[in-house]
Each structure stands twice: as C-alpha cells, then as structure tokens.
Amino acid sequence: LPRQPVVFRREQREQAATDSVAHLLDGATGIWFGGGDQARLTAVLRGTATERAIHRRYAVGAVVGGTSAGAAVMSALMITGDERRPGGERRDTTTAYMTIARDNIVTDSGFALLGGAIVDQHFLRRKRHNRLISLVLERVPHLGVGIDESTALIVASDGQWRVNGASAAVTHNAKSARVRG
C-alpha cells in the first residue's frame, strides 16, 4: 500500500518530544534526513520520543538514510562541521582542515545508527581527508567513512557496505595507528 510521507520541520523540538509526532513513524518502512545543519538536527531530535521511534523502526528493518547533514547524523560520534582554531581565530574556508592536528575537529553525539564508524560527507568534492584523518586518529572507533556528493553508502542488514552513485566513499582506518607527540 502506498504511504503518505510525514514531513517534520527540524526546528520544532517541542513537537519531536511528543508521542503524537513519534507515532507518525509507526509502520514507517523508510526514514530520510535531508541536508542542512547536522548539529541543529541532533539538537532538535536527540533524546526525544521521535528519536526513540526512529531507533525502534530501524531495529525492525526500516531503511534510514540521509544526505549531507542527514548522513553525518548516522554515526555515534558526529562531525559538526566546525573547526577549532588557535587563539579563537576565525575559520578561513580556503585553508580549513589543511593540516592533520589534534583536537581541531568539533564533534557532538549523532544518532548512532551506523555503528563502528564516523561519517563525513561531501568528502572528495570538499577535500575533507585531513578532517576525517584527524578525528579517526584521536577518537574511537578509529574508523571513518567519507561519502562524496551524489554517492550513497548502503549498509545491509548483515553490516556489509556497498557504494552506489556518481563518485566514491573512502575509508580511513586508524585502529592500529600509533600517534606520537
């Protein structure tokens, strides 16, 4: 049977906290997170009845996905998109993430739907290797996946990953890395 889409506006945390909104997901076979600001998305949904409903649906086989910020929220440790700069200087987008450095990536809690990896998005197009490498070197789970634009990482129920789309997904595995200094 065809289902009607449920559109949820991210700025409405009060609604996300209600059982009546969470129940809109009852029976959902697919849940999609659009782009925007991943920190804002998690601030609205984290710890609410709606987030719990998303996890329940996922646990029984619903497909959960997202683009851009919607992909970033999938991991337990989420990249917010902000970079710490020495002395509080403003981030220069032309030189952002030019180096691999300790404690320069701002993170928050994501929805933990993709276990065991940190997700980064727009990866190749925006040259985010150093950002993800910096993070996987210092933070558990020490595995990162960078998904490029117009590309999807499909995670099967058995945990196997498959890439589909116009570009690629890149993994950085630092589980055996040793960092000096």
Go through each PLM region and give its residues:
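Catalytic-core regions built around general acid/base machinery
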Residues: 24-27, 47-61
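Short, active-site-adjacent cap segments at secondary-structure transitions
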Residues: 38-39, 71-74, 152-154
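Glycine/Thr-rich phosphate-binding loops of Rossmann-like dinucleotide-binding domains
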Residues: 41, 75, 82
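C-terminal and late-domain segments of enzyme folds
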Residues: 1, 78-80, 84-181
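N-terminal beta1-alpha1 cap of cysteine-dependent amidohydrolase-like domains
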Residues: 1-35
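Catalytic nucleophile loop
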Residues: 32-35, 58-78
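Glycine/threonine-rich flexible loop motifs
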Residues: 38-47
